[in-house]
Every structure is written in C-alpha cells, then in structure tokens.
Amino acid sequence: MKILYCAAEADPFIKTGGLADVAGTLPLEMKKQGHDVKVVIPLYKLIDEEYKKKFEFEGSFYVDLDFKHHYVGVFKYIHRGVEFYFLDNEDYFNRDNVYGEYDDCERFVFFSKACVQLLRYIDFDCDIIHSNDWHTAMVNVYARDFAKGDPFYESIKTVFTIHNLKYQGVFSSNSLRQTDLSPMYFTEDALKFYDAINFMKGAIVFSDRVTTVSKTYADEIKYSFFGEGLDGVIRQYHYKISGITNGIDTTIWNPETDKYLFKNYSLKNIKDKDENKKALQRMYGLEEKNVPVFAMVTRLVENKGLELVRYIMDEFLTTEDVQVVILGTGDYSYEEMFKYYEWKFPDKLKANIYYNNEESHKIYAGADFLMMPSIFEPCGISQLIAMRYGTIPVVRETGGLRDTVQSFNEFSKEGNGFSFTNINAHDFLYTLRRAISFYYNDDFNIIKENAMNSKNDWEKSAKEYIELYEEIIK
C-alpha cells in the first residue's frame, strides 16, 4: 500500500509536542510491515543544520493561492528506511517559531495545498493520504477538491487523525479567500463554523475516515465537556470516527540500552532500577533513602490536572514520607506553585522548571511512580514510557490513560498502575496513598513487572491503521 503521511512536525527533525513522536515513528513501523510510506513536513529554519546538510534537493514547483504564485522547494532525506520530504518556502518557514505566527492560517494552507500537489510532482500514485491535526487538516479538503476535476486524485482516499481537539485552526471567514477554494465551502456542511472557518471541521467532513489517538477519546469527544464546540459535528459523523491508541518508539525508550541512564536494566535484573533511583536522588539533592519517589514530566497547564495537584500537594507532602520530582514548563501560576512547594518542602520536592530530554530519561528510570491526573488526555505518552521503565503510573481514567493503564487488583494480581475516575482532588489523594501502600509490600514488584510487560510499541497500532486503510480502499 502507498501512503502519504502529512504532519506539521516529526521527530527527530522538529518537535514541539506529541504529534512529532507519532509522525516520526508510526510511518517507520508501517514501512517495517511492508508498505510504501512517504512523510511530508515543512522545511523549518529551526531544523538542525546537521540534518539539513544531508537533505537532497529534488526540484521545485509552484502553488497558487490568493492570486499569488508561491515557490515550493522539495528536499528529501531517507530516515531509517523511510522517505521524508521537506517543503521549503522561506517566506513561511524561515521563522523562529513553528506555530504562533500572525499568518499561521496562510502558512498551513500553503503547506496543505503543496502536500497534495507534491504527489503529482514526485509521481507518487498513493492509495491513502493521512493528515494530522489542524495544521494539515486542509490537505484532505484539497484532495477532495482536486479529485473533482483531475483523474490523478480521483481514487485517493483520505484519513485524518485528531491528536487534540482543543486546537482546531479557526480563522475569520475572510481567510477563505486565502485558500483559493470556492465560496461554496463556506457552508454549514463544509468549513463554516459560526461566522468563521474551521480547518479541523473541514477535515472531519471531507475525510473518508477520522481517527483519534485512543478509543476512549473517540467516545469522549461526542460530548460537550470534551467536544470543544465540535461535539455536534463529531456526533453527526460518528460513523466514520474511531480510535487507535498511540504507541512509543521502543528503540529510543529502552531501559536496556538507554544511553542516558545511570545504569541500564531490564525485567530480568529490575533491581538495577534502584541504582537509577539513588542516582536521581543524588542528582537533585534529595536524601538518598527508601521512600516512594513520585514524578511529573509534563507541560504545566490546567488540562494536565494541576488544579488537583494544587489542592492536595500541601497535605500530601505534610502527611506522607515521599519525594516528588517535577520536570516541565508551562503556565506561570503552575511554575510558581511548584517553586513555592520546593521552598516549603526542600527535602521532599524538587521543581525543575524547564525541559531537558536527558533528564526526562533519568526521571522515567529513577522514579517509582508517575503522576498523571489529567482532566483530559487524548492519548498520553508519558504513561507508556513510564511503564516501559517499570515506573508505575497513577492516572485519572480519561482518554488514552483509561485505555492503557489498568488499576492493580491485589486479589487477581492484574494491573499495571493505579487510577481514579472523578475529577476530584481527594480521589486523587486517596489513589496516591493507595499506591504508597503497595510500595511497602511484595506486590510492588509484581506491578512493576506488569507495567514492563505492557506492550506499547507501534506494531499493533500500525496494523490497526493498515486495516483501516484497507477497509476504505476496497
């Protein structure tokens, strides 16, 4: 099968969030399973020169938008057997930021149309175009529009993945002019969203199939609490929406070979995980003692459940003999909150208000528990990484957290973590205390083993995507 995979970012070239992890690893697994996959992302100024100097220039073509003729430079690089294409236009991508520019609408409309035209330029007669999130949502709209008058595009089927419904690509109705699409697209059954246009809505309407990054999230977004104003559209098109849970790249996240760990370990010698814990305590100036170490590696924003953390942290640190390690940046109020708790409990909490990839590896290996009390979590990657390293997740049952973390049952000995259901601070505190109670008995090693035995690589997810593709091209 031939697949064009379009995204705004892909690891290891450019990364601002979890989308890059997916776009950088899922196509590799599809290739491994015997399919012809090509990935397309913009050629950002921010991509490391070490990669850029290896890119091969393939030529150029032009995209017409809003009565303008826009240059598209085409570069190619083969990464782990997969062809990655980088589309160049200095006006749009020679910026200091990936997102958040004043002309994001125009930038990603240009990129989306260029992705569709790229197929003809490289003569790639693909079966599937797979786009991701609002940045490339218009790819599927253009593919449908091109198919009306061009036989080259008639048989191509489209899939769109929602990684986070919160960010939809909503722009003023005047922005429709920048797309070069007919005014007929400004209707309720197309791009119109109140008095604006909505890229993500367009992808939901015009794609052959729509996926979310977990099965539970696909159900949740049908309701107003999670639907971000699009729940009506989600319910209308429910028949073509399904969930496929993300995986992780287990070659990168592997405690046996991870170069960042203080000491490598595996399920067979899991006791060596303790050496990572002791080294982590030393690194952050915490007392090296046998107490549970809880960690959070996250963006410090409200939807990560930080209001629940704010409500219980003082009581938790006052009453429990624990240590807490934080790694991440985000909203000022939450950054200051953790700085305050570090000041108040210097022997119990270390707040690292920054992000460092190497330190994240050390924390995943050295902590005993990972806290993820998210209000909503489309999939979540941190809990998958934590389990890979034998660090036990404590989560709220939402989205991908519900799909991947099974609360431990002390009678059947099944389960790979701990969970609670309600958005309630003391339910969270109770669950933390329940986790601590198992730290001091023999079941703790069983839970760690269950977590490490959880299969969270991309193999199963890639197979599900391929099955989905096969369904729609029959």
Curated annotation (Swiss-Prot):
Pathway: Glycan biosynthesis; glycogen biosynthesis. Belongs to the glycosyltransferase 1 family. Bacterial/plant glycogen synthase subfamily. This is Glycogen synthase. ADP-alpha-D-glucose binds at K15. Signal peptide: none annotated. InterPro entries: Glyco_trans_1, GS/SS, Starch_synth_cat_dom. HAMAP family: Glycogen_synth. GO terms for biological process: glycogen biosynthetic process. GO terms for molecular function: alpha-1,4-glucan glucosyltransferase (ADP-glucose donor) activity; alpha-1,4-glucan glucosyltransferase (UDP-glucose donor) activity. It catalyses: [(1->4)-alpha-D-glucosyl](n) + ADP-alpha-D-glucose = [(1->4)-alpha-D-glucosyl](n+1) + ADP + H(+). Keywords: Glycogen biosynthesis, Glycosyltransferase, Transferase. Its EC number is 2.4.1.21. Transmembrane segments: none annotated. Synthesizes alpha-1,4-glucan chains using ADP-glucose. The gene is glgA. The lineage of its organism: Bacteria, Bacillati, Bacillota, Tissierellia, Tissierellales. It comes from the Bacteria. Gene3D superfamilies: Glycogen Phosphorylase B.
